Amino acid sequence: MNEEFENFSIYGFSIDYPKECRVEFNPKSRRESGDVVFHFPERNKIFLSWGDLEKATKRFQTIEAHAENSLETVKKTGNVKNFEKVSSDTVNVRSHKAAYNHVRLEQMTAGFFTGRRAVPRDACSVHVHCPDSSRYFVIYALFPHESVEKQEKAIMAMTKSLKCH
């Protein structure tokens, strides 16, 4: 493990996360499904969610379909404009095929003094289906465009470190 990372482990899976992060575990999380947030000092966040693989595979024939559904959900939220897919790829996570996506969008924010304005953001996600643990995992983040390189690097390092079974 890189000295810039520490290990988070729970319910039989683990992931390395940047040491600078504060970890927030959702108290409603269970072995079957849940999420954890890794908070960066500059207020960016990377999320790790997991759930029942059987439920996911009933809804989605492929990992790509699961990932595409997540992108469509983001696209349809009322505060998103100018949604553009920057890249998509297949990556390997512990012998499992995983779907990686990077999108660019404008998030509409409302400020008391500034009114509604469009803030450029990037989002990255990795979807993994693990039959060995009967779970799916999603690593994702939404962050300011100027921090793309740092956040994408962190997400890919976390993805490579995920021990899903």
Give the ranges of each region predicted by the language model.
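Solvent-exposed loop/turn segments at secondary-structure junctions
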Residues: K55, Q107-M108, H145-S147
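N-terminal low-complexity, Pro/Thr/Ser-rich intrinsically disordered segments
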Residues: M1-E6
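Secretory pathway targeting signatures of secreted, lumenal, and periplasmic proteins
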Residues: Y11-V74
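Short, solvent-exposed coil/turn segments at beta-strand boundaries
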Residues: D16-K19, P41-R43, R94-H96, V128-Y136
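Short aromatic-centered micro-motifs
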Residues: F8, F38, V91
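Short, mixed charged/polar active-site loops
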Residues: K45, A118-D122, S134-Y136
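Signature of long, low-cysteine stretches enriched in small and polar/charged residues
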Residues: E68-C130
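Surface-exposed amphipathic alpha-helical segments
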Residues: C21, S133-H165
